[in-house]
Amino acid sequence: MCSKRFCTLILLGVMVIVSSMSAWSLRLEKIKYGDFSNWVTRSITESSVLGGKTKKVYEIAPTQSIVGNKPYRNQGGSPWATSNVYAKVVGIVKASNTVSPFDRGGGNKCVKMSAMMEEVKVLGVINMDVMVQGTIFLGQINEPITSTKTPYSKMEMGIPYTKRPVALVFDYKVDMPATNTRIKSTGFGTPKTLQGRDCAEVYCLLQRRWEDKDGNIYAKRVGTGRERYYKSTGWINGHELRIHYGDITSKPFYKSWMGLLTGDKAPYAKNSRGKMVPVNEVGWDAPNATPTHVMVMASCASGVPFVGTEGLTLYFDNVAFGF
């Protein structure tokens, strides 16, 4: 019979092995273009009153170049949208790029999302800064953007999906600036410095959606996986974001920001009439419910428009559902 100390060491060794193998034990279903090896490069020329520069703006889809100020729709069956946008407000064209390809080494690309101040100058008359944050998600952006009001209403979030994965699996890395502040800057008024740094975030939310006779869309939350990252890391490969089914509000890991999305936090989707409407979550679904849609999002910010920690960067790669 082994000694108590020896048995304990063996047990610990087995636990370490099992823990290190957990990502490999899942069957992975890759999300299309989720290795971020393919990118569309758009060349958008801003209005002459803004200087008339041509900016590079990137999208996640089969490799190609698009020249000209053209609204973008997802190409080649790509399910990914980005916070990179072509805006045309009262006839003035502006481009913004906070999401771009990044070489991990040897030509192995990932996606890089950064928080930065976007400068807007109009012939020396207007000089303002807007805090913009890099974000990618499953869905569509409706271009051109014509106003800064209700940002979520420009984002068609979520795609049809009926499976029940146990995890979202991905590689990630965080660069967190050595500061404990955030900047709020909408472009109107003086930028404000807020105490407390922002954080990067990844979520995978499963919903069961339906539409009423008036075209309103509602949902119940089927599954929840949501994490926030508050400090710098090296590359963490094969990370598992576990998805928990049913009502999680009584679970020890539950945080308020994992809650239901309603009101100004509600995502938007097109209803059967082609109108963008909010998708209000009205409750938690049964633990064995089948979803109709999945929302996957990764961002270098925690979801408040025009608020961020400048320089905070999230790198993201090799995204898959784990079963």
Predicted regions span which residues?
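A short secondary-structure junction signal
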Residues: 180-185, 214-217
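A short beta-strand element within beta-rich, extracytoplasmic domains
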Residues: 164-174
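Extended, low-complexity, turn-rich repeat/linker tracts enriched in Gly/Pro/Ser/Thr and Asp/Glu
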Residues: 174-181, 192-197
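Bacterial Sec-dependent N-terminal signal peptides
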Residues: 1-30
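Aromatic (Trp/Tyr/Phe) and Gly/Pro-enriched flexible surface segments
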Residues: 26-165, 195-246, 257-322
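N-terminal non-cleavable signal-anchor helices
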Residues: 15-19, 133, 172
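Substrate-binding/catalytic groove segments of enzymes
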Residues: 180, 249-257
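Short, conserved, GDST-rich strand-edge loop motifs in beta-rich repeat architectures
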Residues: 186-192
